[in-house]
């Protein structure tokens, strides 16, 4: 079946006694609304990724099913996980800590005072890309941080305890009056001010 079958997935989880569930915030929102409170009775771990976890979705799952959603972060090139909240190392509104053996560097971004552009390397990083202009030649990752490093294109902040907060994509910032502004924040403010309308 497809994850878009919002009523079927909870039924399958119930019938098959699933103990782990992975999904995006969007899918988990729909599953949470469509499911009966007992559908996820065997589920012990719910992991969210690929997009920011909506706090309302996290609250819905905690109240309706007694399950805390563990948010993670990664990229396809990194097989795909880089950071993850766990039951014993959890901090709300973050994507958790880096997995063991994942190295990271933050490269400053002009106009952004907090955090930096995330570059990573580790055993889970791809070997490289095959590019159309050089068929059959593997191009290893290369970034500002050096050979073997992958530029995620994301601006993140890391707190004193090692928890990572994704601030946005570098391409999703605009320079306004000399200051870098996250377009996602503008969208969130517009939605909060007028939730019944679509916003660009």
Put a short name on every predicted segment:
Residues 18-23, 32-91, 103-105, 110:
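Gly/Ser/Thr-rich phosphate-binding loop
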Residues 94-101, 110-142, 179-181:
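Conserved ATP/PPi-binding loop(s) of AMP-dependent carboxylate-activating enzymes
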Residues 104-106, 137-139, 154-158, 200:
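A structural signal for short hydrophobic beta-strand segments in well-ordered beta-sheet cores
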Residues 14, 21, 116, 122, ...:
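AMP-binding/adenylate-forming catalytic core of the ANL superfamily
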Residues 26-28, 53, 125:
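Alpha-helix capping/helix-boundary segments
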Residues 50, 74, 96, 154, ...:
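Active-site glycine-centered loops adjacent to acidic/histidine catalytic or metal-binding residues
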